[in-house]
């Protein structure tokens, strides 16, 4: 349905309902145990985030995963989906996958896979998106752009998390937001508070942690406070409060009641207010 909504003719579709990670259709090993993967010029994926999967040790023999030395955790299949798509990417192709930010910095096995991807020079860019873009989740997500045949070992970081239009139920990337991401990706240059081209050595110094704030500084300094102006405003506010209290006392003194208890209460309020005014 998603393909049809984006004007892909059904004659150009090949659909299969199966467990992607369990059955690498239409591929598989031949009678000699050799795998013949079907490769694509482009791979685009938005898999279920942090899904569970069967990461038994036999998966380490799977050609999709074995070159990375570790398997994605049982309760977080994010890197399993990533490696599946990357395996089917042509040598000169480009892959883009949407995942939660956790894949950028989580440790243990995921850190091992992330390090291997960087050492193999397969991560091309990391693009942080705004929160609440998708119907299924409100969490902020990230686009990882991957290639198998990069010319340089740097990685472009883009923080596009603040560039969006707030809708009634979800946020929307405007045309200018998308154009800015694309132009920045093509230019591969630093943009103040938006993008940074990090060298492999810089990433290595950060222990292969790809958390975007480590590379793109979006900090906005607080404006300087004019203490004299603040003091004057505070004095003016206090003066206004005193005027209002005096006006209230005058109004209360005009009140009368045959009920002695009510009048006693009013007089107590007047006494307290006059004490504060002094």
Residue ranges and their predicted role:
Residues 1-10:
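Short, conserved SAM-binding/catalytic segment
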Residues 20-23, 27-278:
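A conserved structural/catalytic subdomain of Rossmann-like adenosyl-cofactor enzymes
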Residues 10-20:
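Conserved SAM-binding strand-loop segment of SAM-dependent methyltransferases
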């Amino acid at each position: 349905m998603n393909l049809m909504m984006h004007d892909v003719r059904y004659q150009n579709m090949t659909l299969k309902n199966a467990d992607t990670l369990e059955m690498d259709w239409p591929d598989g090993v031949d009678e000699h145990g050799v795998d013949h993967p079907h490769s694509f010029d482009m791979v685009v994926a938005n898999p279920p985030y942090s899904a569970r999967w069967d990461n038994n040790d036999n998966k380490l023999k799977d050609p999709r995963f074995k070159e990375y030395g570790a398997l994605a955790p049982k309760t977080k299949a994010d890197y399993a989906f990533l490696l599946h798509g990357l395996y089917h990417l042509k040598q000169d192709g480009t892959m883009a996958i949407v995942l939660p930010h956790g894949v950028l910095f989580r440790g243990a096995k995921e850190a091992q896979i992330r390090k291997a991807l960087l050492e193999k020079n397969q991560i091309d860019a990391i693009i942080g998106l705004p929160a609440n873009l998708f119907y299924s989740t409100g969490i902020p997500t990230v686009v990882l752009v991957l290639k198998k045949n990069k010319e340089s070992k740097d990685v472009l970081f883009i923080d596009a998390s603040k560039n969006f239009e707030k809708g009634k139920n979800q946020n929307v990337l405007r045309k200018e937001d998308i154009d800015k991401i694309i132009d920045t990706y093509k230019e591969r240059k630093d943009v103040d508070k938006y993008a940074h081209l990090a060298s492999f050595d810089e990433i290595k110094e950060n222990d292969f942690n790809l958390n975007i704030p480590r590379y793109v500084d979006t900090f906005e300094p607080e404006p300087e406070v004019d203490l004299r102006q603040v003091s004057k405003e505070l004095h003016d506010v206090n003066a206004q409060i005193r005027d209002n209290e005096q006006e209230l006392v005058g109004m209360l003194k005009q009140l009368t009641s045959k009920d002695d208890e009510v009048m006693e209460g009013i007089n107590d309020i007047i006494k307290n207010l006059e004490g504060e005014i002094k």
